[in-house]
């Protein structure tokens, strides 16, 4: 069965890559391309918007216009937009792949509650490499984390509006959980001035915003005499798009529930 797939955020940074990834995967059919209401791209052909030839699929400004044509929606928008799509998808029986970042704790709880009645893949990073790195971080934290100083450094392009990145926060969550800590209690976001001696139980975050960096993350476990660094660098957003499409295909074989890319890739356990 070919999966009817929609893209929300088709005019954004991920939009063109998602269009190309859908068109390249024989398991899916791109049946909807959604931008914000009033966007100048509404009415344009989704293929042409992605820098390809026309595919006969006009961009629409509202999910309700195409909800009967979609089995699974891939959403890379903004938190408030994703939450609106969440309600529409639940009502229409559409599965949802969420790549949006920048959610508050309360918004994340809304997503988790909605997943009790629908299938959702929610991951701040759809890259296979990043999710393999998360697995390695869990192992490293259990082996050396208790005695190491842990720092997370991330870099993205100048246009990214949330910091730290969702991926950096997820990395911090994985490390903290492996150590039996709560990230909210031990995270330090940047340092300035006279900060005093480092608290050994903290996890530090540093953020860089510059140029056109697609995404780079390094987690450092620094002990006396040695340190371990686990790094992932993305050179193209296509890796995220391919991962999102892979998640959409996987999700169609699942029931209700909240999943992440670790589930999709079989990395849990």
UniProtKB/Swiss-Prot annotation:
EC number(s) given by UniProt: 1.17.1.8
Pathway the protein contributes to: Amino-acid biosynthesis; L-lysine biosynthesis via DAP pathway; (S)-tetrahydrodipicolinate from L-aspartate: step 4/4
Domain of life: Bacteria
InterPro entries: DapB_C, DapB_N, DapB_N_CS, DHDPR_bac, NAD(P)-bd_dom_sf
Residues given in the record as NADP(+) binding sites: 36
Binding site for (S)-2,3,4,5-tetrahydrodipicolinate: 157, 166-167
Pfam families: DapB_C, DapB_N
Keywords, ordered alphabetically: Amino-acid biosynthesis, Cytoplasm, Diaminopimelate biosynthesis, Lysine biosynthesis, NAD, NADP, Oxidoreductase
GO biological process: diaminopimelate biosynthetic process; lysine biosynthetic process via diaminopimelate
Primary residence: cytoplasm
Residues the entry annotates as binding NAD(+): 9-14, 99-101, 123-126
Catalytic activity, as annotated: (S)-2,3,4,5-tetrahydrodipicolinate + NAD(+) + H2O = (2S,4S)-4-hydroxy-2,3,4,5-tetrahydrodipicolinate + NADH + H(+); (S)-2,3,4,5-tetrahydrodipicolinate + NADP(+) + H2O = (2S,4S)-4-hydroxy-2,3,4,5-tetrahydrodipicolinate + NADPH + H(+)
Biological function: Catalyzes the conversion of 4-hydroxy-tetrahydrodipicolinate (HTPA) to tetrahydrodipicolinate.
Name of the protein in question: 4-hydroxy-tetrahydrodipicolinate reductase
Organism: Methylococcus capsulatus (strain ATCC 33009 / NCIMB 11132 / Bath)
Lineage of origin: Bacteria, Pseudomonadati, Pseudomonadota, Gammaproteobacteria, Methylococcales
Gene name, Swiss-Prot/TrEMBL: dapB
């Amino acid at each position: 069965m070919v999966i009817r797939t929609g893209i929300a955020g088709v005019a954004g940074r991920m939009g063109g890559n998602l269009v190309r990834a859908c068109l390249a995967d024989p398991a899916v059919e791109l049946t909807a391309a959604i931008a914000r209401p009033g966007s100048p791209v509404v009415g344009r052909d989704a293929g042409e918007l992605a820098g390809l030839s026309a595919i006969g699929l006009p961009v629409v400004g509202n999910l309700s216009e195409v909800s009967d044509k979609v089995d699974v929606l891939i959403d890379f928008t903004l938190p408030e937009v994703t939450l609106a799509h969440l309600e529409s998808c639940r009502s229409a029986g559409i599965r949802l792949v969420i790549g949006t970042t920048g959610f508050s704790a309360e918004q994340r709880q809304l997503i988790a509650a909605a997943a009790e009645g629908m299938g959702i893949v929610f991951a701040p990073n759809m890259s296979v490499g990043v999710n393999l790195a998360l697995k390695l971080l869990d192992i490293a934290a259990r082996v050396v984390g208790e005695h190491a100083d842990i720092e997370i450094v991330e870099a993205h392009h100048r246009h990214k509006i949330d910091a730290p990145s969702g991926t950096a926060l997820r990395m911090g969550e994985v490390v903290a959980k492996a150590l039996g800590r709560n990230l909210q209690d031990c995270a330090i976001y940047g340092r300035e001035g006279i900060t005093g001696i480092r608290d050994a139980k903290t996890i530090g975050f540093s953020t860089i915003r510059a140029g056109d960096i697609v995404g780079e993350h390094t987690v450092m476990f620094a002990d006396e005499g040695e340190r371990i660094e686990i790094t992932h660098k993305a050179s193209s957003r296509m890796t995220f798009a391919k991962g999102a499409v892979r998640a959409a295909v996987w999700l169609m074989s699942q029931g209700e529930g909240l999943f992440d890319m670790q589930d999709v890739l079989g990395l849990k356990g």
